[in-house]
């Protein structure tokens, strides 16, 4: 059992993601469970920003091995302009 736990900790998946809200705006976040996080946004239990802009649609994500990498990338993406974010989305 402890072997499995340590193995999981060696290769965790963390995601930086962008969702498009129903009003056309973009929201960037990070999570360790991408499918669940998008569902959470869509039932109104996610970020305050997305609660009144449902439904949201996943348009972009990147995978990282650590929370620190994912949150660093989240910050970097949040610094981009809307146009730059769309370029990133379309390039993938």
Q: How does the language model describe each region?
A:
Residues 1-46, 51-55, 61-63, 68-78, ...:
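GIY-YIG nuclease catalytic motif and its immediate N-terminal context
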């Amino acid at each position: 059992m402890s072997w499995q736990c340590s193995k999981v900790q060696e290769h965790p998946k963390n995601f930086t993601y962008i969702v498009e809200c129903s009003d056309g705006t973009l929201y960037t976040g990070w999570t360790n469970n991408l499918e669940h996080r998008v569902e959470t946004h869509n039932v109104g239990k996610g970020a305050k920003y997305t609660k009144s802009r449902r439904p949201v649609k996943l348009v972009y994500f990147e995978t990282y091995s650590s929370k620190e990498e994912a949150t660093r990338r989240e910050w970097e993406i949040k610094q981009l302009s809307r146009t730059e974010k769309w370029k990133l989305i379309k390039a993938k």
